[in-house]
Protein backbone atom coordinates (compact mmCIF):
# COMPACT_ATOMS: atom_id res chain seq x y z
CA UNK A 1 0.00 0.00 0.00
CA UNK A 2 3.02 2.24 0.32
CA UNK A 3 2.63 3.60 -3.17
CA UNK A 4 -1.17 3.74 -3.18
CA UNK A 5 -2.01 6.28 -0.45
CA UNK A 6 -0.63 9.80 -0.46
CA UNK A 7 -1.07 12.95 1.62
CA UNK A 8 -1.11 16.28 -0.18
CA UNK A 9 -1.43 19.73 1.34
CA UNK A 10 -3.18 22.15 -0.97
CA UNK A 11 -6.23 22.87 -3.08
CA UNK A 12 -8.21 19.76 -4.05
CA UNK A 13 -9.70 21.59 -7.06
CA UNK A 14 -6.26 21.79 -8.70
CA UNK A 15 -5.43 18.07 -8.49
CA UNK A 16 -5.19 16.18 -11.77
CA UNK A 17 -6.78 12.93 -10.60
CA UNK A 18 -9.59 10.89 -12.12
CA UNK A 19 -12.04 11.69 -9.33
CA UNK A 20 -12.33 14.43 -6.74
CA UNK A 21 -14.58 13.66 -3.79
CA UNK A 22 -16.78 16.52 -2.69
CA UNK A 23 -17.85 16.79 0.95
CA UNK A 24 -21.35 17.74 -0.13
CA UNK A 25 -24.49 18.73 1.69
CA UNK A 26 -27.64 16.66 1.08
CA UNK A 27 -29.01 19.12 -1.50
CA UNK A 28 -25.87 18.77 -3.70
CA UNK A 29 -26.29 22.46 -4.54
CA UNK A 30 -22.95 23.66 -3.21
CA UNK A 31 -22.27 25.46 0.02
CA UNK A 32 -19.32 26.58 2.08
CA UNK A 33 -15.87 25.12 2.56
CA UNK A 34 -14.61 22.52 0.12
CA UNK A 35 -18.12 22.04 -1.32
CA UNK A 36 -18.31 25.69 -2.36
CA UNK A 37 -14.72 25.68 -3.64
CA UNK A 38 -15.38 22.63 -5.84
CA UNK A 39 -18.60 24.12 -7.24
CA UNK A 40 -16.89 27.46 -7.99
CA UNK A 41 -13.92 25.80 -9.70
CA UNK A 42 -16.07 23.37 -11.69
CA UNK A 43 -18.39 26.04 -13.06
CA UNK A 44 -22.08 25.80 -13.98
CA UNK A 45 -21.85 22.33 -15.56
CA UNK A 46 -21.38 20.78 -12.11
CA UNK A 47 -24.43 22.52 -10.69
CA UNK A 48 -26.47 21.39 -13.71
CA UNK A 49 -25.33 17.79 -13.17
CA UNK A 50 -26.24 17.99 -9.49
CA UNK A 51 -29.67 19.39 -10.35
CA UNK A 52 -30.29 16.37 -12.60
CA UNK A 53 -29.32 14.00 -9.80
CA UNK A 54 -31.68 15.82 -7.41
CA UNK A 55 -34.51 15.60 -9.93
CA UNK A 56 -33.98 11.84 -10.21
CA UNK A 57 -33.48 10.94 -6.55
CA UNK A 58 -33.97 13.97 -4.30
CA UNK A 59 -31.51 14.74 -1.52
CA UNK A 60 -28.43 12.57 -1.05
CA UNK A 61 -28.69 10.87 2.36
CA UNK A 62 -25.86 11.03 4.89
CA UNK A 63 -23.27 8.34 4.19
CA UNK A 64 -24.34 7.94 0.56
CA UNK A 65 -22.55 9.11 -2.58
CA UNK A 66 -23.36 10.03 -6.18
CA UNK A 67 -21.11 10.64 -9.17
CA UNK A 68 -21.28 13.45 -11.74
CA UNK A 69 -19.13 14.97 -14.43
CA UNK A 70 -16.40 17.35 -13.26
CA UNK A 71 -17.14 20.49 -15.26
CA UNK A 72 -14.07 22.72 -15.49
CA UNK A 73 -12.05 20.77 -12.91
CA UNK A 74 -8.94 18.86 -14.04
CA UNK A 75 -10.61 15.66 -12.78
CA UNK A 76 -12.80 13.42 -14.93
CA UNK A 77 -15.60 13.10 -12.37
CA UNK A 78 -16.77 14.30 -8.97
CA UNK A 79 -18.14 11.97 -6.33
CA UNK A 80 -20.41 13.88 -3.96
CA UNK A 81 -20.73 12.30 -0.54
CA UNK A 82 -22.59 13.54 2.49
CA UNK A 83 -20.72 13.09 5.72
CA UNK A 84 -22.37 13.26 9.12
CA UNK A 85 -22.80 16.36 11.24
CA UNK A 86 -20.97 15.76 14.54
CA UNK A 87 -23.50 15.49 17.36
CA UNK A 88 -21.20 14.29 20.13
CA UNK A 89 -20.55 10.81 18.76
CA UNK A 90 -23.80 9.23 19.92
CA UNK A 91 -25.72 9.45 16.62
CA UNK A 92 -23.88 6.76 14.61
CA UNK A 93 -21.48 9.38 13.22
CA UNK A 94 -18.53 6.95 12.97
CA UNK A 95 -20.48 4.49 10.82
CA UNK A 96 -21.94 7.25 8.66
CA UNK A 97 -18.49 8.72 8.02
CA UNK A 98 -17.10 5.29 7.18
CA UNK A 99 -20.05 4.80 4.80
CA UNK A 100 -19.28 8.13 3.10
CA UNK A 101 -15.73 6.96 2.35
CA UNK A 102 -16.76 3.42 1.39
CA UNK A 103 -19.57 4.49 -0.93
CA UNK A 104 -17.24 6.98 -2.60
CA UNK A 105 -14.59 4.31 -3.13
CA UNK A 106 -17.18 1.90 -4.50
CA UNK A 107 -18.31 4.46 -7.10
CA UNK A 108 -14.70 5.14 -8.11
CA UNK A 109 -14.00 1.42 -8.55
CA UNK A 110 -17.34 0.68 -10.27
CA UNK A 111 -16.58 3.36 -12.87
CA UNK A 112 -13.02 2.02 -13.42
CA UNK A 113 -11.28 5.18 -12.26
CA UNK A 114 -7.72 4.71 -11.03
CA UNK A 115 -7.12 7.77 -8.84
CA UNK A 116 -9.19 9.66 -6.30
CA UNK A 117 -8.65 12.65 -4.01
CA UNK A 118 -10.50 12.99 -0.70
CA UNK A 119 -10.92 16.08 1.44
CA UNK A 120 -11.28 15.67 5.20
CA UNK A 121 -14.99 14.84 5.07
CA UNK A 122 -17.19 16.34 7.81
CA UNK A 123 -14.37 18.22 9.57
CA UNK A 124 -15.39 21.72 8.49
CA UNK A 125 -18.77 23.21 9.37
CA UNK A 126 -20.07 19.72 10.19
CA UNK A 127 -17.74 19.81 13.20
CA UNK A 128 -16.37 16.25 13.21
CA UNK A 129 -13.20 16.12 15.35
CA UNK A 130 -10.26 16.09 12.94
CA UNK A 131 -8.25 13.31 14.59
CA UNK A 132 -11.23 10.97 14.86
CA UNK A 133 -12.28 11.69 11.27
CA UNK A 134 -8.73 11.09 9.99
CA UNK A 135 -8.55 7.74 11.79
CA UNK A 136 -11.78 6.61 10.14
CA UNK A 137 -10.65 7.88 6.74
CA UNK A 138 -7.25 6.17 6.86
CA UNK A 139 -8.61 2.89 8.24
CA UNK A 140 -11.50 2.73 5.76
CA UNK A 141 -9.39 3.57 2.70
CA UNK A 142 -6.55 1.25 3.74
CA UNK A 143 -8.90 -1.69 4.25
CA UNK A 144 -10.71 -1.02 0.96
CA UNK A 145 -7.60 -0.88 -1.20
CA UNK A 146 -6.17 -4.08 0.29
CA UNK A 147 -9.24 -5.89 -1.09
CA UNK A 148 -9.71 -4.01 -4.38
CA UNK A 149 -7.48 -3.24 -7.37
CA UNK A 150 -9.16 0.13 -7.91
CA UNK A 151 -8.52 2.86 -7.15
CA UNK A 152 -4.80 2.44 -7.67
CA UNK A 153 -3.96 5.82 -6.09
CA UNK A 154 -5.71 7.59 -3.22
CA UNK A 155 -4.87 11.11 -2.12
CA UNK A 156 -5.88 12.70 1.17
CA UNK A 157 -5.87 16.40 0.39
CA UNK A 158 -5.44 18.56 3.45
CA UNK A 159 -6.03 22.28 3.47
CA UNK A 160 -3.48 22.94 6.21
CA UNK A 161 -0.16 21.58 7.43
CA UNK A 162 -1.52 20.40 10.78
CA UNK A 163 -4.08 18.12 9.15
CA UNK A 164 -1.53 16.87 6.62
CA UNK A 165 0.79 15.85 9.47
CA UNK A 166 -2.10 14.09 11.18
CA UNK A 167 -2.81 11.94 8.10
CA UNK A 168 0.89 11.26 7.52
CA UNK A 169 1.30 10.14 11.13
CA UNK A 170 -1.70 7.80 10.90
CA UNK A 171 -0.47 6.30 7.64
CA UNK A 172 3.00 5.77 9.09
CA UNK A 173 1.48 4.01 12.11
CA UNK A 174 -0.42 1.71 9.77
CA UNK A 175 2.68 1.12 7.66
CA UNK A 176 1.03 2.57 4.56
CA UNK A 177 3.56 5.27 3.74
UniProtKB/Swiss-Prot annotation:
Q: Which reaction is catalysed here?
A: 3''-O-acetyl-ADP-D-ribose + H2O = ADP-D-ribose + acetate + H(+); 2''-O-acetyl-ADP-D-ribose + H2O = ADP-D-ribose + acetate + H(+)
Cited Pfam families: Macro
The keyword Nucleus appears for this protein: no
InterPro entries, per database record: Macro_dom (IPR002589), Macro_dom-like (IPR043472), O-Ac-ADP-ribose_deAcase (IPR024900)
Keyword vocabulary terms for this entry? Hydrolase, Stress response
Per the UniProt entry, the Enzyme Commission number(s) are 3.1.1.106
Q: Which HAMAP family match?
A: YmdB (MF_01205)
Q: How does it assemble?
A: Homodimer. Interacts with RNase III. Interaction with the ribonuclease decreases homodimer formation.
Name the UniProt record assigns to this protein: O-acetyl-ADP-ribose deacetylase
**Native species:** Escherichia coli (strain K12)
Q: Which gene encodes it?
A: ymdB
